[in-house]
């Protein structure tokens, strides 16, 4: 938590003073995102003061992630980098340069930002559609696997019934063959009865 009190703290500052200084620096560094404010500072000669230039160098600690997360206007870090160059500090005193920067910022918000949001939405929609297609394909593959298992299951029953029918036909075919050995005996009995009847007829 001590980091939020800013860098460059000394032993003379109390914790309350450090916190207040951190809040002041947070507010000031975010004001740098306004080109009109930069033009105001340039026209007042602040950018010619070496102590103020050193202060701008000191404020670069806001670029660190531990501090940048508190910024509501991160565009200020871009202008903070530009202010490190003497050429930019000299040109920003011109009102036309300030107006050009302001117009470019407005154009970015009106067009680029909206286009970027639309691109992000399109990419998100495409990813969602791809995920849905993958899910549908997985479901279709699962249904095909289940259908294939059901169609393959009756095969043993068909083979079993066919083998049963074959065994029945085989047994029915064997029955006459088994009955054939008894035919000669029956034939002999029939022949014996017929010969006995003939003898009786002759005696009469």
From Swiss-Prot:
GO terms of molecular function: transcription coregulator activity
InterPro entries: Med31_sf, Mediator_Med31
A Pfam family that the UniProt record links to this protein: Med31
Primary localization class, coarse: nucleus
Compositionally biased intervals (Low complexity): 161-194
Free-text function comment from the UniProt entry: Component of the Mediator complex, a coactivator involved in the regulated transcription of nearly all RNA polymerase II-dependent genes. Mediator functions as a bridge to convey information from gene-specific regulatory proteins to the basal RNA polymerase II transcription machinery. Mediator is recruited to promoters by direct interactions with regulatory proteins and serves as a scaffold for the assembly of a functional preinitiation complex with RNA polymerase II and the general transcription factors. Required for activated transcription of the MtnA gene.
Name of the protein this chain belongs to: Mediator of RNA polymerase II transcription subunit 31
Organism per entry: Drosophila melanogaster
């Amino acid at each position: 938590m001590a980091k939020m009190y800013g860098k460059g703290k000394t032993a003379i500052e109390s914790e309350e003073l450090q916190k207040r200084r951190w809040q002041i620096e947070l507010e000031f560094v975010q004001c740098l995102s306004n080109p009109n404010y930069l033009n105001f500072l340039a026209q007042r000669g602040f950018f010619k003061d070496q102590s103020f230039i050193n202060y701008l160098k000191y404020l670069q600690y806001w670029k660190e992630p531990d501090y940048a997360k508190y910024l509501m206007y991160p565009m200020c870090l871009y202008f903070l980098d530009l202010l490190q160059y003497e050429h930019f500090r000299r040109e920003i005193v011109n009102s036309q340069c300030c107006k050009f920067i302001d117009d470019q910022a407005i154009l970015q918000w009106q067009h680029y930002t909206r286009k970027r949001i639309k691109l992000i939405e399109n990419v998100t929609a495409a990813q969602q559609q791809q995920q849905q297609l993958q899910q549908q394909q997985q479901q279709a593959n699962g249904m095909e696997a289940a259908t294939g298992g059901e169609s393959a299951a009756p095969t043993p029953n068909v083979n079993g019934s066919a083998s049963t029918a074959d065994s029945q036909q085989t047994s029915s075919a064997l029955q006459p063959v088994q009955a054939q050995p008894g035919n000669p005996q029956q034939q002999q009995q029939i022949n014996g009865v017929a010969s006995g009847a003939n003898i009786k007829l002759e005696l009469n």
